[in-house]
C-alpha cells in the first residue's frame, strides 16, 4: 500500500505508522530502513513496549515492570493431568499494535488526554488482501477512525498479486512482519528465522513453559512440543 501510494496508484498517504513490538525480525527492521530511504511519505515508528521483555517480567500471568497487567500472547497449552490441548486468548495485538497506533493518531490530531476525538476524523488504511478478507474488522476499533482496505475496496489484489506488483516494479520481496516468537508461525516461518532469532525463540519457549501457576505447560509451537525439539521439515 505504501509503495502503491508512492507511485500514485493509490491516493497519497499523509503518513505510515509502524508499531514496533520490540521483538521483530532483523529483516523487518532492515525493510523499514529501506522503505524510509526510497519514499517521501513519512514513516512513523510507535511502540507499546517490548513484548519479550514484558513477558519476562510478567512470567505469563503477573505484572509488567510498570505494574500493569501483561497482555497474553496466544500460547498453546497442554494440561498436565489430562493431556488436553488448548490455547490462551490473544491480547497482544491490541496492546502492542492497535493501541500505540491509536495514541499516535490522537497526537497527530492535536488531541489532549481525555479530549473526545471527532468521529471519522482519520481514514486508516489496513493492508489486508482479498484472500485474507476474513481478517477484516467488523467495525472500527474507535470512533475517530474510518477503516479502509485498499487492496480490497480500491483495487482487488491477492497476496500473490501484491508480490507480482513488487517484482514488476523491481522491489525486493518483504519478509512477513511478525514477532520472532509469534505462536502463529508456520514451520516454514520458524525455519526462515536466522540462527540468533531461532535461539532467542527457543530460550523464550523454555522461559514460559510452566510459569504463572497454570494447570498446564505453555508452548509457542502449535504441536505443544518444545520448539528446540520440533521437526520443522514437515
Model-derived regions, located:
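Nucleotide-activated chemistry modules centered on ATP-dependent adenylation/adenylyltransferase
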Residues: 1-234
Amino acid at each position: 500500500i505504501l509503495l502503491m501510494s508512492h507511485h500514485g496508484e493509490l491516493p497519497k498517504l499523509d503518513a505510515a505508522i509502524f508499531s514496533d513490538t520490540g521483538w521483530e525480525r532483523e529483516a523487518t527492521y532492515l525493510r523499514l530502513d529501506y522503505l524510509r530511504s526510497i519514499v517521501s511519505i513519512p514513516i512513523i515508528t510507535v511502540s507499546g513496549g517490548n513484548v519479550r521483555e514484558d513477558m519476562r517480567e510478567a512470567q505469563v500471568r503477573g505484572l509488567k515492570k510498570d505494574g500493569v497487567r501483561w497482555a497474553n500472547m496466544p500460547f498453546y497449552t497442554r494440561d498436565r493431568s489430562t493431556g488436553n490441548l488448548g490455547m490462551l486468548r490473544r491480547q497482544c495485538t491490541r496492546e502492542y499494535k492497535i493501541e500505540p497506533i491509536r495514541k499516535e493518531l490522537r497526537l497527530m490530531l492535536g488531541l489532549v488526554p481525555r479530549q473526545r476525538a471527532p468521529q471519522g476524523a482519520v481514514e486508516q488504511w489496513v493492508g489486508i488482501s482479498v484472500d485474507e478478507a476474513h481478517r477484516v474488522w467488523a467495525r472500527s476499533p474507535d470512533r475517530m477512525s474510518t477503516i479502509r482496505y485498499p487492496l480490497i475496496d480500491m483495487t482487488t489484489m491477492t497476496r500473490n498479486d501484491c508480490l507480482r506488483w513488487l517484482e514488476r516494479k523491481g522491489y525486493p520481496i518483504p519478509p512477513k512482519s511478525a514477532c520472532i516468537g509469534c505462536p502463529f508461525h508456520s514451520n516454514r516461518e520458524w525455519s526462515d528465522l536466522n540462527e540468533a532469532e531461532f535461539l532467542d525463540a527457543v530460550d523464550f519457549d523454555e522461559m514460559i513453559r510452566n510459569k504463572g501457576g497454570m494447570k498446564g505447560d505453555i508452548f509457542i509451537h502449535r504441536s505443544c512440543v518444545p520448539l528446540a525439539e520440533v521437526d520443522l521439515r514437515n
